[in-house]
């Protein structure tokens, strides 16, 4: 009888310790800094949201925030910034953004090369 009570107590203690440790665990850090990016792309494609300049400023602020948190920008972020920069007539900055997207995500190389070729940047 004493052995059963002792085993039961041990089991309860292990379960309680597991619950406490699991409850204190931190959530995993997201792989990318998505804050506002998806909404911004939606507004851009919808066409009746904020102006390209306003959205560009918001996205550049998001990029700064991501750098401050040492978080990676999501796939397509730099490319979208580049498209906004093109719309604003900032061709050199757009080229730099497309090249940065190509470097960060090599799988986007074909599309970035296409956009760069359309710009005459080869």
Regions found by a protein language model. Give the residues of each.
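TPR/TPR-like alpha-solenoid helical repeat scaffolds
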Residues: 45, 109-122
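Helix-turn-helix repeat elements of alpha-solenoid scaffolds
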Residues: 47-61
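Structural register within alpha-helical repeat arrays
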Residues: 80-81
């Amino acid at each position: 009888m004493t052995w059963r009570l002792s085993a039961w107590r041990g089991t309860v203690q292990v379960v309680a310790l597991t619950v406490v440790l699991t409850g204190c665990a931190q959530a995993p850090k997201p792989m990318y800094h998505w804050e506002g990016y998806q909404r911004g792309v939606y507004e851009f494609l919808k066409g009746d949201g904020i102006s390209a300049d306003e959205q560009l400023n918001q996205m550049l602020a998001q990029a700064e925030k991501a750098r401050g948190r040492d978080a990676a920008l999501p796939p397509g972020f730099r490319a979208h910034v580049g498209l906004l920069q093109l719309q604003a007539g900032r061709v050199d900055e757009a080229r730099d953004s497309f090249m940065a997207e190509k470097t960060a995500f090599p799988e986007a190389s074909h599309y970035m090369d296409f956009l760069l070729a359309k710009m005459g940047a080869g």
